[in-house]
């Protein structure tokens, strides 16, 4: 699995370096993103610009990551490709997450 993270001020940016988040990788993705998010991160941006496909298992992993953040901490999404954005729209997950066109716009 390929995730990287960096801080921009107090904002943690986690980038997914993969083309698919599906049932085959969802559990590992969830575990790795949880490991990337430390207790100091009050605001997390998940950069999905490299992801071209996501299924319900992938959505579930992202929702689980959001639920890990408690006490006013938040998870925003950035850089969704048109295909991934469509999945978020069809499942109405676009009403659950704040979605930005890019990481720069999310900052």
Regions found by a protein language model. Give the residues of each.
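Short beta-strand/loop segment at the start of cytosolic alpha/beta domains
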Residues: 1-14
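Conserved beta-strand segments of the P-loop GTPase G domain that flank and frequently precede/overlap
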Residues: 14-16, 46-47
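Short alpha-helical segment
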Residues: 105-106
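Amphipathic alpha-helical interaction surfaces in cytosolic regulatory modules
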Residues: 21-97
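Short acidic-hydrophobic, aromatic-tinged amphipathic segments that line or gate anion-handling sites
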Residues: 98-102
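Generic beta-structure capping elements
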Residues: 8, 16-19, 80
């Amino acid at each position: 699995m390929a995730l990287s993270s960096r801080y921009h001020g107090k904002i943690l940016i986690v980038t997914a370096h993969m083309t698919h988040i599906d049932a085959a990788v969802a559990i590992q993705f969830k575990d790795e993103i949880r490991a990337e998010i430390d207790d100091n991160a009050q605001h997390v941006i998940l950069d999905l610009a490299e992801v071209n496909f996501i299924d319900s298992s992938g959505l579930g992993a992202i929702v689980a990551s959001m639920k890990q953040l408690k006490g006013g901490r938040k998870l925003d999404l950035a850089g969704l490709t048109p295909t991934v954005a469509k999945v978020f729209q069809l499942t109405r997950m676009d009403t659950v997450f704040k979605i930005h066109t890019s990481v720069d716009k999310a900052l």
